[in-house]
Amino acid sequence: MGCLACHHTDRCVIKDDINSIIDKLVESELIVFGVPNYFDNVSGLFKNFMDRLHPLYKSKQLKNKNVIFIYVGGGEENGTKKELHQAINGFCKYLSLDIKKEFSFRALNIDEVNKQKEKIKEILNNIKNMSSI
């Protein structure tokens, strides 16, 4: 919509569930985002979600909030992480989020991520360790 009404209210004026999602993000100690890679960028849906968090830009309610990103794409893991990090870095800069860790999965087919047990274990351990900070 791009109306910028949130600059005056610190809330989105669109009547849907984004304000309750924002409240949950603000209350969280740690935020974990799962981000698919489409054509070396975040998916359109995730980009829409990022844009809907615009009320948090001016209010800085997420300042220094710890964030973990989990990327999934069909290319090499490091390539996916590199490409998505660029888009995510700007998002985090403007919302003053603190990226604590980034993980990347290579997966093209349904259930391919679930077969990567060691990586899942590593991510869960990182989340457990961070949530005790």
Give the ranges of each region predicted by the language model:
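Glycine-rich phosphate/pyrophosphate-binding loop and the adjoining helix
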Residues: 20, 89-133
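Helix-loop-strand module that forms the ligand-binding subsite of alpha/beta enzymes
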Residues: 13-95
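A generic structural signal for short
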Residues: 9-10, 76-77, 127
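Alpha-helix boundary/capping residues
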Residues: 7, 53, 127-130
